[in-house]
C-alpha cells in the first residue's frame, strides 16, 4: 500500500472514531457578534435547524466529496426567542403521535447517510431495536421533539437563545455606497432587555406561526391558544380533581386532542367542544393524496398560475386544515356513545360536542366568577338560527384551537420595504425562497429568505415538516452555493475512497 493511501485510511478511521458532537462542532464555528456574518437565521425551530444540518453535511467530507477541508468557513448565527430549543411544547399531549413518517425527519430525504437522521438518533440513544419492536412509522410527538432537540444541541456554538429579533435594517459598507450590501439584525435579550446588533450579508426569517385568535374573543388570561395547552393551562387549573368547566373552540387535530385529553387530565370536569362545522372530519393521508407533500410537488405548485394555486390549495385542504386523524375521531365517538348508553339526553352529558355553533360574546365574570360564553347555532356557516339557536356556557377556561398566522416577518422587515421592486406591494419569494429585491438598491451578494410563510407560492407543505430535509439542502445551495463551489477541493484518492 502506498504511504499516501495508508495515511488517508488512517485519517479516515481517526475521523470515524471521533465523537459525533466533536465532528459537528468542527463544521460550524461561532462568529463574534461584531463580525460581518455570511448568514443570520432569525428563529431556530425545525426550518432553521434543517438549514444548519444541511450546511453541516455540505461541509462534511464523508458526505460531500468536494467539501472544503480548510480555508473558507461559513460565518453563521442563529437567533432564537425561546430560552432553549422547543417544538410545539404546548401541544406535547400525552399519547399524541406524529402525523408523518419518521423518514420525513430533518435529513433522510436529502441524504440518508447523514448522522442527523431519526434512525441515527435512536442508535445514539440505544433505542433502535426497541423502537423497531413498535412496528410503527409514527413515533410519539414527545420523542420526535426530543430527536430535534438532540439535533439542535449539536449546534449550540452558533445558536443564541433568549434573543428576540425586533428589526432588520439596511446596511452599507461605506456611506457613499449606492447599494445596500448587508443587513443589520437587532435583537432584545428576553431576560435583561439589552439590545444587541449583528450584521450579515444574508438573512433568513424562519419565525414559525403566531397564535390566531377570533376577533370576537376578549383578552382574558383564562382564554388561551392551543399552543399553550400543556404549559399554561396547568398553571390556571391547578387541581386535577376539581370539577372545572372547560370549553374548546375548533374542529381540527389540536382541538380534538385537547378535548380528548381534558377528560383524562381533569376527570371530574365538564368539557364542551364548540365548532362551526357540522362534525369532525377525518384527515386524508391516503398514499396518492399524500403525494401533495412530496418535495418535487413544490416545483409544480410554484409554476402554477395564481388561480391554479388557489384551486390546488382548496382541493388539498383535507390533508391538513380543520381535520382530525380517523383513529382519534373513532375514540372520541366511542366515548360519546358510552355517555349515550347512560343517558340519551345530550344536554346532561359530562362531555359534549356542539357542532354548527359559533361564539358570539364572552362575559368576563358570571356566577362563581366563571366566564359566560354565549354560543349561537349557525347553518351552513351563516348566521341563520337553528331551533332556539342560543346557549350560554359557564366556563373556567376556554382553549382556542383556531390555527396560526404566518406574517410576523412583515413587521420585522418594515424598515427595508423600500428595497422591494416598485411593482410589488408585498414580499414575494422566488422558487429558492429568496425574496425579490430591487437590485439597483441591493448588491447581488445580499439577500433575504423566507421560510414557513410561503404557502401561497410554494404549496401546502411550506409550513410543515414533510419537506424540511430537502428544503434545507435547497436553502444551503441558494445561500452558499457559489462559496461552496469556489472553496471546493478537487477529488483525491482519499475523497474517492469516501
Curated annotation (Swiss-Prot):
Keyword Membrane on entry: no
Keywords in alphabetical order: FAD, Flavoprotein, Monooxygenase, NADP, Oxidoreductase
EC number: 1.14.13.196
One MF term in the entry's GO annotations: ornithine N5-monooxygenase activity
GO biological process: cellular response to iron ion starvation; cellular response to oxidative stress; ferrichrome biosynthetic process; intracellular iron ion homeostasis; siderophore biosynthetic process
Reported consequences of knocking out the gene: Essential for viability. Grows only on siderophore-supplemented growth-medium, but shows decreased conidiation.
Pathway where it operates: Siderophore biosynthesis
Record: residues binding substrate: 104, 290-293, 320, 466
Cofactor binding notes: Binds 1 FAD per subunit.
Annotated binding of NADP(+), by residue: 251-254, 276, 320-322
Quaternary state and interactors: Homotetramer.
Family: Belongs to the lysine N(6)-hydroxylase/L-ornithine N(5)-oxygenase family.
Protein name per the record: L-ornithine N(5)-monooxygenase
Annotated organism of origin: Emericella nidulans (strain FGSC A4 / ATCC 38163 / CBS 112.46 / NRRL 194 / M139) (Aspergillus nidulans)
Amino acid at each position: 500500500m502506498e504511504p499516501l493511501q495508508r495515511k488517508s485510511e488512517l485519517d479516515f478511521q481517526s475521523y470515524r472514531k471521533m465523537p459525533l458532537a466533536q465532528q459537528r462542532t468542527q463544521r460550524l464555528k461561532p462568529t463574534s457578534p461584531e463580525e460581518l456574518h455570511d448568514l443570520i437565521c432569525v428563529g431556530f425551530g425545525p426550518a432553521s435547524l434543517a438549514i444548519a444540518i444541511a450546511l453541516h453535511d455540505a461541509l462534511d467530507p464523508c458526505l460531500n466529496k468536494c467539501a472544503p477541508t480548510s480555508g473558507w468557513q461559513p460565518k453563521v448565527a442563529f437567533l432564537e426567542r425561546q430560552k432553549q430549543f422547543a417544538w410545539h411544547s404546548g401541544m406535547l399531549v400525552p399519547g399524541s403521535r406524529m402525523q408523518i413518517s419518521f423518514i420525513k425527519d430533518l435529513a433522510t430525504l436529502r441524504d440518508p447517510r447523514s448522522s442527523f437522521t431519526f434512525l441515527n438518533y435512536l442508535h445514539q440513544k440505544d433505542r433502535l431495536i426497541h423502537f423497531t419492536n413498535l412496528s410503527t412509522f409514527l413515533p410519539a410527538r414527545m420523542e420526535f421533539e426530543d430527536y430535534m432537540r438532540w439535533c439542535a444541541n449539536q449546534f449550540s456554538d452558533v445558536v443564541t437563545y433568549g434573543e428576540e429579533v425586533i428589526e432588520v435594517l439596511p446596511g452599507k459598507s461605506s456611506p457613499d455606497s449606492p447599494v445596500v450590501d448587508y443587513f443589520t439584525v437587532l435583537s432584545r435579550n428576553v431576560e435583561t432587555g439589552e439590545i444587541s446588533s449583528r450584521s450579515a450579508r444574508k438573512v433568513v426569517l424562519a419565525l414559525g406561526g403566531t397564535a390566531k385568535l377570533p376577533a370576537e374573543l376578549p383578552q382574558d388570561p383564562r382564554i388561551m391558544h392551543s399552543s399553550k395547552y400543556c404549559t399554561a393551562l396547568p398553571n390556571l387549573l391547578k387541581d386535577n380533581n376539581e370539577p372545572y368547566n372547560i370549553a374548546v373552540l375548533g374542529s381540527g387535530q389540536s382541538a380534538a386532542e385537547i378535548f380528548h385529553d381534558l377528560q383524562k387530565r381533569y376527570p371530574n370536569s365538564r368539557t364542551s367542544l364548540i365548532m362551526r362545522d357540522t362534525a369532525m372530519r377525518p384527515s386524508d393521508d391516503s398514499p396518492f393524496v399524500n403525494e401533495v407533500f412530496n418535495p418535487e410537488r413544490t416545483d409544480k405548485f410554484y409554476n402554477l398560475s395564481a388561480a391554479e394555486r388557489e384551486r390546488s390549495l382548496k382541493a388539498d385542504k383535507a390533508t391538513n386544515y380543520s381535520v382530525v386523524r380517523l383513529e382519534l375521531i373513532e375514540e372520541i365517538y366511542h366515548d360519546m356513545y358510552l355517555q349515550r348508553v347512560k343517558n340519551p339526553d345530550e344536554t346532561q352529558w359530562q362531555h359534549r360536542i356542539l357542532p354548527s355553533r359559533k361564539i358570539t360574546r364572552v362575559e368576563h365574570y358570571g356566577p362563581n366568577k366563571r366566564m359566560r360564553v354565549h354560543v349561537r347555532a349557525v347553518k351552513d356557516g351563516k348566521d341563520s338560527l337553528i331551533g332556539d339557536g342560543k346557549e350560554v356556557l359557564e366556563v373556567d377556561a376556554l382553549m382556542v384551537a383556531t390555527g396560526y398566522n404566518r406574517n410576523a416577518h412583515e413587521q420585522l422587515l418594515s424598515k427595508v420595504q423600500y428595497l422591494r421592486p416598485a411593482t410589488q406591494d408585498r414580499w414575494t419569494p422566488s422558487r429558492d425562497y429568496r425574496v425579490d429585491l430591487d437590485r439597483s438598491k441591493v448588491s447581488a451578494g445580499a439577500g433575504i429568505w423566507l421560510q414557513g410563510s410561503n404557502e401561497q407560492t410554494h404549496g401546502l407543505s411550506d409550513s410543515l415538516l414533510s419537506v424540511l430535509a430537502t428544503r434545507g439542502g435547497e436553502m444551503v445551495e441558494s445561500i452558499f452555493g457559489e462559496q461552496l463551489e469556489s472553496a471546493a477541493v478537487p477529488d483525491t484518492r482519499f475523497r474517492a475512497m469516501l
